[in-house]
């Protein structure tokens, strides 16, 4: 089982590297994917679908995970390839938002936490809106970590959702734990 997981990780890493190289060389390709941000494969335009399958050449992405990976690729293309160097996982970046922006982020993420990935695109639409909100706050979201999270989103243990919440509140918990249990009179 451990070897299978390692092989899967290598395939995902190899696929993401191909995406980064292709999009880094070709702004037109990035634009094709960017225009389809928030879409699933069945509703995406033909150029984006063709480009995705061409880059997935060796079947690095399983058929079961194609929509999730396509979503992550298109979402990553919301940002320029040269911005990817400062990309951070979704909830890690949110910790740096000011209190009003963080409250708006939390509201959006709470909705996502209870939703399963669906073939109709409801989850994708909600997540796409959250990512566009992040972009408006100058936060670059790491597409590779997003892709891995989406692949594991429906796991029975909900470890992705738990990690998102843990990461979101990690810094706040450290700061607010000072004085917990102290008498303030």
Task: Report the location of each language-model feature.
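Basic, alpha-helical nucleic-acid-binding regions used in initiation and control of genome expression
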Residues: 11-74, 78-185
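Extracellular/secretory pathway and lumenal proteins
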Residues: 1-2, 138
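N-terminal "first-domain core" detector
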Residues: 2-9
């Amino acid at each position: 089982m451990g070897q299978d997981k390692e092989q899967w990780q290598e395939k995902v890493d190899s696929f993401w590297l191909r995406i980064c190289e292709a999009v880094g060389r070709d702004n037109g390709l990035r634009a094709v994917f960017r225009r389809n941000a928030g879409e699933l494969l069945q509703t995406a335009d033909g150029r984006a679908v063709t480009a995705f399958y061409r880059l997935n050449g060796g079947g690095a992405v399983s058929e079961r995970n194609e929509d999730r990976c396509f979503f992550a690729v298109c979402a990553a293309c919301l940002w320029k390839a040269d911005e990817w160097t400062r990309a951070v996982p979704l909830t890690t970046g949110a910790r740096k938002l000011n209190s009003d922006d963080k409250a708006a982020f939390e509201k959006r993420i709470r909705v996502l936490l209870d939703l399963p990935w669906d073939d109709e695109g409801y989850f994708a639409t909600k997540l796409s809106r959250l990512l566009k909100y992040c972009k408006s706050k100058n936060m670059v979201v790491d597409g590779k970590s997003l892709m891995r999270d989406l692949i594991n989103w429906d796991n029975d243990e909900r470890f992705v959702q738990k990690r998102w919440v843990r990461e979101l509140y990690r810094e706040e918990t450290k700061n607010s734990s000072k004085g917990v249990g102290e008498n303030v009179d």
